[in-house]
């Protein structure tokens, strides 16, 4: 049986990863484009996220606009939005299961059922981590591919935003926390030893006349 400290550590890491996924989803910094004109005053930075894009001027002014339609996003960001939302929901289910199966809670009385619930929670967190790392890595791959593509204009080339690094950190926390929770082994049920006795044969009766 894994110690309570290991279980608490796994839950804490997974919850931090869950919060980081929500931050990754909310921040409009998946892709960053920098336009620098002849005058530094005219320079601006464009942030592209899953829900909106923002234009940051060199003066510090920032204007954000929510996407009018889902079709306004590129295909990789459309898929990323769906997968990240699913990851948040799956991780929330993992948090609920970890609370139910926690050693310090009384939702379940059976220790074996608690351990099995924590294992399921760990698997759910692992799934949530995979659902995050796939869209983040896919978006980063497309950004790097376009950056080194000579056919793409320099003004259209983008760089990786902070949301991608937050997403990688979130997936790492979820995978690590889920892995620790999967170390919960159900306690062995010691079956009482039942000794079987064979009926002793009585000694041969004396012969009666």
Swiss-Prot record:
Keyword Ion transport listed: yes
Pfam families given in the database record: PMP22_Claudin
Record-annotated disulphide pairs: 54-64
Compartments, as annotated in UniProt: Cell junction, Tight junction; Cell membrane
Entry membrane topology: Multi-pass membrane protein
Family: Belongs to the claudin family.
Quaternary assembly: Interacts with EPHA2; phosphorylates CLDN4 and may regulate tight junctions. Directly interacts with TJP1/ZO-1, TJP2/ZO-2 and TJP3/ZO-3. Interacts with CLDN1. Interacts with CLDN8.
Name the record gives this protein: Claudin-4
Organism of this sequence: Chlorocebus aethiops
């Amino acid at each position: 049986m894994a110690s309570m400290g290991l279980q608490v550590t796994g839950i804490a890491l997974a919850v931090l990863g869950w919060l980081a996924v929500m931050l990754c989803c909310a921040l409009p910094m998946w892709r960053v484009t920098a336009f620098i004109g002849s005058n530094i005053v005219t320079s601006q930075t464009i942030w592209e996220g899953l829900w909106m894009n923002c234009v940051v001027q060199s003066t510090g002014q920032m204007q954000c606009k929510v996407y009018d339609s889902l079709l306004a996003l590129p295909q990789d960001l459309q898929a990323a939005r769906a997968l990240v939302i699913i990851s948040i929901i799956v991780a929330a289910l993992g948090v609920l299961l970890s609370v139910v199966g926690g050693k310090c809670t009384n939702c379940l009385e059976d220790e074996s059922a608690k351990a099995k619930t924590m294992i399921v929670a760990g698997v759910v967190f692992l799934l949530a981590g995979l659902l995050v790392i796939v869209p983040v890595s896919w978006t980063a791959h497309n950004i790097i591919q376009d950056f080194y593509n000579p056919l793409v204009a320099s003004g259209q080339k983008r760089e990786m935003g902070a949301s991608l690094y937050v997403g990688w950190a979130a997936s790492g926390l979820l995978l690590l926390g889920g892995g620790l929770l999967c170390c919960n082994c159900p306690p062995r049920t010691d079956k009482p030893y039942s000794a079987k006795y064979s009926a002793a044969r009585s000694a041969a009766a004396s012969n009666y006349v």
